């Protein structure tokens, strides 16, 4: 996080769902420096979990693929996953924002080969599948996840499974010593796009 450079000309977008991603891309393509933060390990938000979405009844993968290509091609846009806003102070045009990043335990050497996931035995409820399926303790959130980098569940750290994951990685991508980090940046504007909660279908009689 120490290499995050921002000025009062920078736009901070909070939330990596379709609204936040769209806002960040559009601003970056207009020439603005943009930092996009998302609390989860990957971008996409609720839309990435849907089968189809209204009104075109398209599969989310279509629009996501286009937007992810735009993100990768734009040097004005910096993406920080597993990051939340801790504090905001200041005024329009000059905000001071504290960002807190939780450890992924996987660094940028990761190629998403999946060897770590095959090596571990621990399983947990899949957040992406609303708890209806299980996922491994070392996992890629979903096939089109951006960044394409595995995550180690923090409940696995300190166990034999964590060491199995590290031993299985040929790229030295597993870093079990990662710690939570905090940094303070200065930005000129903030877009708050933290998403929505789906209706609890259990309430339907």
In which residue ranges do the predicted regions lie?
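Conserved Rossmann-like nucleotide-cofactor binding loop
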Residues: 19, 41-42, 197
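Flavin (primarily FAD) binding-site architecture
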Residues: 194-205
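N-terminal glycine-rich dinucleotide-binding loop that anchors FAD/FMN and/or NAD(P) in oxidoreductases
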Residues: 48-85, 127-147, 205
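Beta1/beta-strand and adjacent pyrophosphate-binding region of the FAD-binding site
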Residues: 3-19
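Iron-sulfur cluster-binding cysteine motifs and their immediate structural context
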Residues: 28-42, 90-92, 96, 111-152, ...
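Core beta-strand elements of the Rossmann-like FAD/NAD(P) dinucleotide-binding domain
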Residues: 7-9, 105-107, 181-189
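Short hydrophobic core segments
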Residues: 14, 37, 186-195
């Amino acid at each position: 996080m120490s290499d995050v450079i921002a000025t009062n000309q920078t736009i901070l977008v909070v939330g990596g769902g379709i609204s936040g991603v769209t806002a960040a891309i559009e601003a970056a393509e207009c020439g603005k420096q943009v930092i996009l933060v998302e609390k989860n390990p990957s971008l996409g938000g609720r839309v990435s979990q849907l089968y189809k979405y209204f009104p075109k009844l398209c599969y989310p993968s279509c629009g996501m693929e286009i937007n992810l290509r735009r993100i990768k091609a734009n040097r004005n846009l910096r993406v920080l996953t597993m990051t939340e806003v801790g504090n905001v102070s200041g005024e329009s045009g000059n905000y001071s924002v504290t960002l807190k990043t939780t450890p992924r335990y996987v660094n940028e050497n990761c190629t998403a080969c999946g060897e770590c996931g095959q090596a571990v035995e621990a399983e947990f409820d899949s957040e992406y599948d609303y708890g209806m399926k299980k996922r491994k303790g070392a996992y890629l959130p979903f096939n089109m996840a951006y960044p394409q980098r595995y995550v180690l569940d923090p409940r696995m750290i300190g166990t034999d499974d964590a060491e199995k994951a590290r031993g299985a990685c040929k790229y030295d991508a597993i870093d079990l010593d990662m710690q939570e980090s905090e940094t303070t940046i200065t930005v000129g504007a903030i877009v708050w796009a933290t998403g929505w909660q789906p209706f609890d279908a259990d309430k339907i009689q």
